[in-house]
């Protein structure tokens, strides 16, 4: 059986919270911000949790996270 490896891209983008949920950053806030409203950029500022339907993919990408 091959070694289990953590996806390097996933370990840079996600953090596992103590309750077992996964924290992620919002998309659409890196560039082309001049055409976005201040309200839109403000709503994109905070971190959100990964949806429960995607938690299976998270467990595959982060096998040692205990998901």
From Swiss-Prot:
Pfam families, per the entry: Ribosomal_L35p
Region described as Disordered: spans on this chain: 1-24
Regions that span the bilayer: none
Record PROSITE patterns: RIBOSOMAL_L35
Keyword Ribosomal protein tagged: yes
GO molecular-function terms, A-Z: structural constituent of ribosome
NCBIfam families tied to this protein: rpmI_bact
Family: Belongs to the bacterial ribosomal protein bL35 family.
Name by which UniProt lists this protein: Large ribosomal subunit protein bL35
């Amino acid at each position: 059986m091959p070694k289990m490896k953590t996806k390097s891209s996933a370990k840079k983008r996600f953090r596992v919270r103590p309750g077992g949920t996964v924290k992620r950053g919002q998309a659409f806030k890196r560039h082309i911000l001049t055409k976005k409203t201040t309200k839109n950029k403000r709503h994109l500022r905070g971190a959100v949790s990964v949806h429960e339907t995607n938690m299976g993919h998270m467990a595959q990408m982060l096998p040692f996270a205990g998901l």
